[in-house]
């Protein structure tokens, strides 16, 4: 026998109005029409498939999150409610997910950084059209070639800063970080970003921008960065303990630091 499992480009969402708790591992009605383009290609590559025919079609739902990573850890806004779901390749990820979820529950942290899977990475903004479009797009591109720094269009412009339109008018090419549109570089030649595993057409433009800021001056839009006010008589000591660098003594001083976990791992940059 030959098993074929394509990720079709005209995917449809299921269960948008909720899923009955009685639904466990049941299957959905077969839909061969959506698979026809893929089946034709299989028959071209493996001619015997065209003569053998199809013995069985298995159709069932599969979960995809907006960024393709599963949801792990404490649920936002709830106490003692833990999540380990949303995995599109759960058989492969299951053992590791269970290990790090157990560490998180028992010790309050994991031995490796699991930020990319942290369920709290999605806020109230990640709902409706955003989640639907991004999840379908992730499914459709499951086994496509993914380039470094690649950002696709579905679900975009969900969160924009006050100067988004100004940056856009100057030729900014945007990426997405936690739903925010963040300028990556400025495409003055209107070429569009040409993704590559090597240096692409953004390299020289980014180099010029870095050189200009280093030797002259520049304005950075940090609106999408999280901001915290730490106050009190022990604020400095607390931050010096938390960060892998010393907090500036000078009022208004700025320093680049890495916030650490109790195990000495890097939680984030600040």
Model regions and ranges:
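Structured core elements
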Residues: 3, 53, 71, 82-83, ...
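Solvent-exposed alpha-helices and their adjacent loops that cap or buttress functional pockets
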Residues: 1, 64, 74, 220, ...
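Glycine/proline-enriched, intrinsically flexible loops and inter-domain linkers
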Residues: 112-113, 118-270
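Extended catalytic-interface subdomain
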Residues: 1-19, 35-39
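Short loop segments at secondary-structure junctions
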Residues: 9, 75-76, 231
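Flexible loop/turn segments at secondary-structure boundaries
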Residues: 10-13, 61-65, 90-92, 183-184, ...
